[in-house]
């Protein structure tokens, strides 16, 4: 009997979570507590709804033409997809049987390395790894947990030579200092499996979800970064030998 997945929702024609037009599956449950999270309602491990790989694939294949025509595919996001690694592995296997490209969007908070993680990565064409912050003190303040597990996962991907894009959320006053950006550059320097770095400007599009849940949004007064700030960060990271986009 196939493993059931607990999902929050899906987006049929996503264009920002991997190449081309993609079917984005938002898995339910996350162990990080990002203060800027725009999917606050995905944290609860018991929330969402259950679905089988078979039923999910019935939905996915209806969009195959759009995905194939644009070099797209499917992306497992969240929440945190790796918390349900067995289900995502089975889903990606089904996608590969249909010739559909697979992408794993993850924060890298992997607690146990076992055959399921390896089997998931074996059927993953691209990993989008969210490196939130290299300064661990800032990371714990902003994200709620240490960054050790994510950094370990980044090194694991390097060891596997796994195709990877790094994603870095630029939050003014938190992740945009020259010192912290240099820490990121130094960490990923020489990681030849990294194809590019994506700078994701902080935004406030998810604030209403916090308020709907009756929760305080601590970054209420933080404004998005300026283009000049993003260009400056881009220049620093390019100095470490990587392609950088925003």
Swiss-Prot record:
Signal peptide: none annotated. InterPro entries: Aldolase_TIM, BssD/PflA/YjjW, Organic_radical-activating, Organic_radical_activase, PFL1_activating, Pyruvate_for-lyase_activase, Radical_activat_CS, rSAM. It is found in: Cytoplasm. Transmembrane segments: none annotated. It catalyses: glycyl-[formate C-acetyltransferase] + reduced [flavodoxin] + S-adenosyl-L-methionine = glycin-2-yl radical-[formate C-acetyltransferase] + semiquinone [flavodoxin] + 5'-deoxyadenosine + L-methionine + H(+). One of its GO terms (molecular function) is metal ion binding. Its EC number is 1.97.1.4. GO terms for cellular component: cytoplasm. Residues 16-241 form the Radical SAM core domain. Keywords: 4Fe-4S, Carbohydrate metabolism, Cytoplasm, Glucose metabolism, Iron, Iron-sulfur, Metal-binding, Oxidoreductase, S-adenosyl-L-methionine. One of its GO terms (biological process) is glucose metabolic process. Binds 1 [4Fe-4S] cluster. The cluster is coordinated with 3 cysteines and an exchangeable S-adenosyl-L-methionine. CDD domains: Radical_SAM (cd01335). The keyword Transcription does not apply. [4Fe-4S] cluster binds at residues 30, 34, 37. Its cofactor is [4Fe-4S] cluster. S-adenosyl-L-methionine binds at residues 36-38, 79, 130-132, 203. NCBIfam families: PFLA, PRK11145.1. Belongs to the organic radical-activating enzymes family. PANTHER family: PYRUVATE FORMATE-LYASE 1-ACTIVATING ENZYME, PYRUVATE FORMATE-LYASE-ACTIVATING ENZYME. Activation of pyruvate formate-lyase 1 under anaerobic conditions by generation of an organic free radical, using S-adenosylmethionine and reduced flavodoxin as cosubstrates to produce 5'-deoxy-adenosine. This is Pyruvate formate-lyase 1-activating enzyme.
